[in-house]
Amino acid sequence: MSDKKRINQIAKETGLSNTELVATAQSLGFEVKSHSSSVTAEQAEKIIQGVKTGTDTIVKPAEKTVKAKIKTVPETAKSKQEDHPRTFAGKAVVEDPAILARIKEKEEAKKAAKTEAEPIEEVITTEKPKVAEPVKKSEPKAAAKAEETKVEKVEAKAKTVTPKAEVKTENVADKKEPVVTEEKKKSLTQKPRIQIKVIKRAEDIKKEQAAARPEKKKFDKNRNDRNNRNDNRRPNQNGNGQGHSQGGNHYDKNRPAGQGQNQGQKRDKFASSGSSSTSDTFTPAASGKNNRRDRDRKKTDSNRDNTKDGNRKGGPLRVNDNRNQVRNARNSNWNQKGGRGRYQNNQSSSVPATQRKFHELPESLEYEVGMNVQDIAKSIKREPAEIIKKLFMMGTMVNQNQSLDEDTIELILMDYGVTPLKKVEEDKSDIERLFVEDGYLNEDKMVERPAVVTIMGHVDHGKTTLLDRFRESRVTEGEAGGITQHIGAYQIKTNGKKITFLDTPGHEAFTSMRARGASVTDITILVVAADDGVMPQTIEAINHSKAAGVPIIVAINKIDKPGANPQRVTQELTEHGVFPVAWDPENGSEFVEISAKFNQNLEELLDTVLLVAEVQELKADPSVRAIGTVVEARLDQGKGAIATLLVQQGTLHIQDPIVVGNTYGRVRTMTNDLGRRIKEAGPSTPIELTGLSDVPQAGDHFAVFEDEKAARAAGEERAKRAQLIKRQNTRRVNLDNLFDTLKEGQTKSVNIIIKADVQGSAEALAASLQKIEVEGVKVDIVHSAVGAISESDISLAAASNAIIIGFNVRPTGLAREQAAQEEVDIRLHSIIYKVIEEVETAMRGMLDPEFKEEIIGEAIVRETFNVSKVGTIAGFMVIRGKVTRDASVRVIREGVVIHDGAIASLKHFKDDVKEVGNAQEGGLMVEDFNDVEIDDTFEVYKMVEIERKK
């Protein structure tokens, strides 16, 4: 043998394990790190001797803690077999007196340690050990194992702790070297704790527990029963003499069920009762019982065991125990439900398997027409079958998916005691209501907006020149290209404020906007030439402005001409209801004398516009979603639908979902009147946009929606409604249906447009018609002028739903065509009292259409045929004219009319025909008349309406 040997060589020679040798060498103070470390022969002998004889002779430094000693003191199966007496049938077999002497010394040291452990605050318990046989007093091996369950922290008494750590042994038949976990380290360092073993007899422990047990709330009965059953079924397998119940007590077959739990929960009651070495069982006790009791209430068994040393000792058993408890609980629930099939428990359970939750009925329910039973059941928290049953008892057979009418829904809700409330659906596609209602506007965010001005007047009075001067005034010299495009509306800035002008060449666009109820104009500038005076179109412009209800600013143009006479123009305008402010301060209009050609007094005209706008207090809310009106629209080959819009409320942004008239889309691009792209447009701002699905019409309203889906739905709905209205016959007011219209309450006044040959006749006719008053309905003269009936008159009549009276005048050819398209009623007269009588008769409902009889044919009966269940069919020959199916027939016999009625059927040979011509044969049957004879004459005629004389 060499001077030094490795630990693994020594293990092979002696048959000992490397772990035991390394642990013993380290406990002797040798520098040994692993089984590959080398020691001298002398050290090897000491190590072998130390393993065989134990570690009693090993002297440890007094300053080392128990924590370190636990790590460095190994236990081997071989040393245990040598140091502890073997047992047979519960009795110790003593083989070596030296071993008995050492055991006795250990017991004395243990007693001394227990008596000195006075300042103890809390017990540090180990995990539940495996089940073992009961420990007897005479068994030193069991006493030594009892020392294994103690983890102690000694503050200043190393002399009493050292022997404990040296004699502490462990059964390593199933487990390896003990390892102190981090949790145990943490618990050792938090508070000065020490474990006390109170060894008593089982009978004494039971008595003390019964006496010291306080009143407490019981745990769940099912849980305790399951735990007790598991404890009774599972044998004690731990070799250290401790059971795996909550208290860690020894398992006793004779003790009552649940005693282990009670002992574990109440071990603090008998912890201070002293110690005894003559008991068959032992129970760890603890101080700080209140904290312990709180933890027992809050933590489950598995959590408390795992926080201690579950991975070392009691962990696997506790996991299995938890799994068994879960399985037992599931089986218990299964048994309560009754099992499955023929193996189910026949005993009836007191608690039903499924218990329906009760829901209170609502006090009221807002319903929609067309709801089915399933919808109602979901709303009132009831089963559909229950509602179907109620309806069946009421005599109504329905299923849960069948739609119900309003009466049935209210009946079933009232039967349940629920107040039915019909839901009022808001038509989101009706964007016109936004122009009538202003409840959505925020008064706190209202700001001043620019005025919208329309220039109207006779075409030869300088309207176009005035528009050009305004355009030139807002274009600076630095702009390249000047005005690049004309979009029908533009803005100018004067005195720090903006004015929006609408370019409306002619009155067609303005009239169409009025017809759609879109009055976007705030102020009208009426241009009148100073040398010509008031012309027919000037009067028409005045009537348009008054019908729109907007103030008028009169611009007397061409004052630079030699024949200009502004005073005469003022006098003529007063005859048509336009008075200067000096004459009528309340309802008067501003008069400004200008010269558009020489830019004379244009600034004064703009200042007047700003003054009138300030008086009107024009405001808008830019924070809401934008609404407005279409000025004009067109279809571009490259860009698609292009619309010129005027924003009236809110702010329009790029990518806004928008509905324009009967179209929809998303704002793709926006261009202002200068041709520049912008990202947003505020109130009274004209813009040109792209992105619509179709070309809208001038005068249509537009509105921004919350999302594109809602905009699409609203646009499609509006297009569908427009198509439906287009298919229906538009009912215009005329003298024939005027009484019915008045009766239905659709009209409270008769709108009339008068066109006469001379001004005197027009004035006299207007005065006479305004005196007619029937049943509270009066005549309203919309427009009265001199001249032929023109297209403008037709447009005005269509917009105002008026009747045109022509006195000694005729309509033009284009006017007739437009009147037929617009379905405008034109009445032509030459006698004034005839006009008054006809209008009054129409208002009273006395005007009936006149008809005359027109004979279209004559036939002679040649043969008759009697057909059962049909009647008599007469075969005839047409001798003059023709016989038609939709005509009436007189049966004449010997010059006397014996019957007058309609033709029921008409045939040519065997074919049904609509007409039989001259010199042709056919057969007919007279409706409700069968007494037809040969040689009777058929006189065929029609009733034709007579056109009234003009």
Swiss-Prot record:
Residues 448-619 form the tr-type G domain. Residues 322-336, 343-353 have a biased composition (Polar residues). GO terms for molecular function: GTP binding; GTPase activity; translation initiation factor activity. InterPro entries: EF-G-like_DII (IPR053905), IF2_II (IPR044145), IF2_N (IPR006847), P-loop_NTPase (IPR027417), Small_GTP-bd (IPR005225), T_Tr_GTP-bd_dom (IPR000795), TF_IF2_bacterial-like (IPR000178), TIF_IF2 (IPR015760). Residues 503-506 are annotated as: G3. The keyword Nucleotide-binding applies. Residues 595-597 are annotated as: G5. Residues 128-158, 165-186, 200-234, 291-312 have a biased composition (Basic and acidic residues). Residues 557-560 are annotated as: G4. Residues 128-354 are annotated as: Disordered. It is found in: Cytoplasm. SUPFAM superfamilies: Initiation factor IF2/eIF5b, domain 3, P-loop containing nucleoside triphosphate hydrolases, Translation proteins. Its main location: cytoplasm. Residues 457-464 are annotated as: G1. Keywords: Cytoplasm, GTP-binding, Initiation factor, Nucleotide-binding, Protein biosynthesis. NCBIfam families: IF-2, small_GTP. Belongs to the TRAFAC class translation factor GTPase superfamily. Classic translation factor GTPase family. IF-2 subfamily. One of the essential components for the initiation of protein synthesis. Protects formylmethionyl-tRNA from spontaneous hydrolysis and promotes its binding to the 30S ribosomal subunits. Also involved in the hydrolysis of GTP during the formation of the 70S ribosomal complex. This is Translation initiation factor IF-2. It comes from Lactococcus lactis subsp. cremoris (strain MG1363). The gene is infB.
